[in-house]
Amino acid sequence: MIVDTSAIIAILRDEDDAAAYADALANADVRRLSAASYLECGIVLDSQRDPVISRALDELIEEAEFVVEPVTERQARLARAAYADFGRGSGHPAGLNFGDCLSYALAIDRREPLLWKGNDFGHTGVQRALDRR
């Protein structure tokens, strides 16, 4: 399973639906995170200036045994195409941002479902991890 930044942030901020994302993580055979998404999570959490939540990211990555995947050339090309098709400036309802495009690309490249929060990826046709449970 590929995990998008949005799902990790929901868990670490203990949002209302955090349990659904935490359960999905716990039940997955493998949890993959793009290196770009790892950085994006860090940027989002570090902007809160709370060292506890900042450390919680690395603790989650370690405890849940995430595989942090480097961005390959193929994924970069898939992400570029995703931005052209589904990006914020494309007029498409998905409105994917930079990090979203890299999560999408990793899911397409690995042919694995994507765990995300929100409605953006639902407009792209990528397989949703929560639908598999």
Swiss-Prot record:
The keyword Hydrolase applies. Keywords: Hydrolase, Magnesium, Metal-binding, Nuclease, Toxin-antitoxin system. One of its GO terms (biological process) is negative regulation of growth. Its cofactor is Mg(2+). It comes from the Bacteria. One of its GO terms (molecular function) is RNA endonuclease activity. It is an enzyme of class 3 (hydrolase). InterPro entries: PIN-like_dom_sf, PIN_dom, Type_II_TA_system_RNase, VapC_family. Residues 1-124 form the PINc domain. Toxic component of a type II toxin-antitoxin (TA) system. An RNase. Upon expression in M.smegmatis inhibits colony formation. Its toxic effect is neutralized by coexpression with cognate antitoxin VapB28. Gene3D superfamilies: 5'-nuclease. The keyword Magnesium applies. Its EC number is 3.1.-.-. Belongs to the PINc/VapC protein family. It comes from Mycobacterium tuberculosis (strain ATCC 25618 / H37Rv). Mg(2+) binds at residues 4, 100. This is Ribonuclease VapC28. It holds the Pfam family PIN.
